[in-house]
Structures are given as structure tokens and as C-alpha cells.
Amino acid sequence: MADGKGPVVALVPAAGQGVRLGENRPKAFVDLGGTTMLTRAVDGLLQSGAVDRVVVIVPEELVESTRTLLPGEVTVVAGGSERTDSVRAGLAVADDADYVLVHDAARALTPPSLIARVVEELRCGRNAVIPVLPVTDTIKTVDVLGAVTGTPERSELRAVQTPQGFTAELLRRAYAAADGIATDDAGLVERLGERVRSIVGEPTAFKITTPLDLVLARALVEEGAH
């Protein structure tokens, strides 16, 4: 059991393709102000001062080139076809971890201070921690034909960011019990009936997914915000 003092290992799945981003390469390797999104995401983790080791998971054919791109202390391993496969590959080389962060490479502008706050919550005894922001748009649920089936109460909704943090023991249990594809690690923990703690996120920790997101991210970098 984690005692609040053990090592923190951050996993960065970076095998997603840049289809919605309009790029012909994995989106983690798209340029953002003269360097890749992946490099910026890893730098943020290291600059937080709260992470002991970073493990990056990429397509097998990019392992060697990624190692030359990142600082020597970063571990790079091959992932799988799905995000869950990549996180499992990262966990397999994180035996030393008491705590694990899972961070999207596409959230390249995440402030180091947010990363440190997630880790602080873990060290204070939380088993699962996620950063969130209030949802500003009204959300509708729809059926397969596009007909509206409901309107969730907006005050109860939150947009989830990363890094998501967990005790290593809990995240391993969640992945051992996972029987399908998941885009959210906290969701796997919830399936175990475990409580997930939310903290206030940061606007700049947005996920760079669409061409418009990339325009915004590049503008922020150019203005010197990051």
C-alpha cells in the first residue's frame, strides 16, 4: 500500500493517429512551436518536480526515433493498437511505482503546477485523482438516429483532463479487471466501485485534437504563454 512517500511514474500513451488533426503522423509528433507535442508534454511532467520517472509508449516503429527525441532518463516502449494496450505496456515497466499518472501527449500545454497538484492529492491519501473543469455548453444525449433523448443537468457535468493519478495498486487492479476498450482510466477505476476525487483543472490543459485546437495551441506558444 502506498504510504505517501513512494515513487511517482508518469505514463504517456502517444500512439494515437492525427486523423482529426488533419495530420499524416501520430498527433504526439506534430510540431508545436518548434518541438513536438510529445516533447512538451514530457517536459511539463519533468518540470513539475513531482514525477520521478516518465514512460512514453509509442508505435513499435517509432521507439528508436522517440528515444533520440526525448531526454535520456525517459523510458520509451512499444504500445499496442488501443490505448488500453499502451497503458498496460507502460505499467509493465513501472514495477517501481507507488503512484502512477496517466497523461495525454496531446495535452501538451498542461501547466507543471497542475501535475504537482494531482501528485500532492495522491500523497495526501487519495487513491484516484482527476483534474476537471465545468462544462459551459448544454449537453444533450441522443439516440442512434440523432433524436434527443435527454438533457443532463449541466451543473453536475465536468470535462475531464489529465494527468489522472492513481495508486499503482489500484490502477493495476482496474486494468486487470478491464474487459474492453476504455478512453478514460478513471472510468476503469469507477467500475471497481472505487471513489475518484476531482480537483480543479486548468484551461490550458486542453486536448489538442482538431485543427482549431492546434491553431489555439500554436497561438499560445507564440505569445509566450508556454
Swiss-Prot record:
The UniProt entry, under InterPro entries, shows:
IspD, IspD/TarI, IspD/TarI_cytidylyltransf_bact, ISPD_synthase_CS, Nucleotide-diphossugar_trans
- Site (Positions MEP for the nucleophilic attack) found at 154, 207
Family statement: Belongs to the IspD/TarI cytidylyltransferase family. IspD subfamily.
What EC number(s) does the entry state?
2.7.7.60
NCBIfam families per record? ispD
Name the catalysed reactions: 2-C-methyl-D-erythritol 4-phosphate + CTP + H(+) = 4-CDP-2-C-methyl-D-erythritol + diphosphate
Cite the position(s) of the site with description Transition state stabilizer.
Answer: 20, 27
Class of enzymatic activity (EC top level): transferase
Q: Which SUPFAM superfamilies match?
A: Nucleotide-diphospho-sugar transferases
Indicate whether Lipid metabolism appears among the record's keywords. no
Instruction: List the keywords (alphabetical).
Output: Isoprene biosynthesis, Nucleotidyltransferase, Transferase
Membrane-spanning intervals of the chain:
none
- Any idea what job this protein has? Catalyzes the formation of 4-diphosphocytidyl-2-C-methyl-D-erythritol from CTP and 2-C-methyl-D-erythritol 4-phosphate (MEP).
This one is known as 2-C-methyl-D-erythritol 4-phosphate cytidylyltransferase
The protein's matches in PROSITE patterns, at most eight in alphabetical order, are given as: ISPD
Species of the source: Rhodococcus jostii (strain RHA1)
A single GO BP term for this record reads: isopentenyl diphosphate biosynthetic process, methylerythritol 4-phosphate pathway
